[in-house]
Amino acid sequence: MKQIDIDDELYQYIASNTQSIGESASTILRRLLNLSGEKIQTANVELNQNNQTTTTLPKVPPVAEQTPALAAKPSAVAEKSVQQKNANVFNVLNKEELAMQKGVVGRFLFILSAFYRTHKTDFRAVLDIKGRDRVYFATSKEDLVNSGSSMNPKNITDSEYWVMTNSNTTRKKMMLHEVALCLGYSTEQAEKIRDYL
């Protein structure tokens, strides 16, 4: 195994270029450096106590062992490049930043903010997401407060939208799932987003 130490600034740059949660440092660097995928390796990146990162690369298997895996990659690569052309919340969400959010409400607002940044023009569709007796989203704090009691409205960061946060985690997950679906994500993607909470 090989290890490299990188400074905090470089680590932040690599992390900010993450396109999907769980993407390896090796994959990100290959994309940034425009390297071909002939010798794809995954890296394990660990943050040490002094905020220095250590990257561990596994041994490269012989070329004969790589061939079957590489034969299966082209369709996945083509599919991924098609997705990258479209606005995608997975390009904006950063796992490290998500983990730093304070509690469930913090993560909830962070994910909604990522949806807003990705889909500013279509985000208005979330206003149609409602409960049986409750309004979940509004364009003003007053609209939420007037729609029911105990709403605890919070502003979705950098947007004119407000969301009701006085609900349990299961309800918040359902709301994220509905937001993803109304913005055009597949059921599988919506479930993945829901599980980030």
From Swiss-Prot:
Q: Is Phosphoprotein a UniProt keyword of this protein? A: no
Q: Where is the protein situated, by its record's location annotation?
A: Cytoplasm
Q: Is Cytoplasm given among the entry's keywords?
A: yes
Q: Which GO terms describe its cellular component?
A: cytoplasm
Q: Which UniProt keywords apply?
A: Cytoplasm, DNA replication inhibitor, DNA-binding
One MF term in GO for this entry? DNA binding
A biological process (GO) annotation for this entry?
negative regulation of DNA-templated DNA replication initiation
Q: Name one Pfam family in it.
A: SeqA_N
Which pairs are disulfide-linked?
none
Which stretches are transmembrane? none
What does this protein's UniProt record list under function? Negative regulator of replication initiation, which contributes to regulation of DNA replication and ensures that replication initiation occurs exactly once per chromosome per cell cycle. Binds to pairs of hemimethylated GATC sequences in the oriC region, thus preventing assembly of replication proteins and re-initiation at newly replicated origins. Repression is relieved when the region becomes fully methylated.
**Binding partners and assembly:** Homodimer. Polymerizes to form helical filaments.
UniProt similarity note:
Belongs to the SeqA family.
Q: What is this protein called?
A: Negative modulator of initiation of replication
Q: Which gene encodes it?
A: seqA
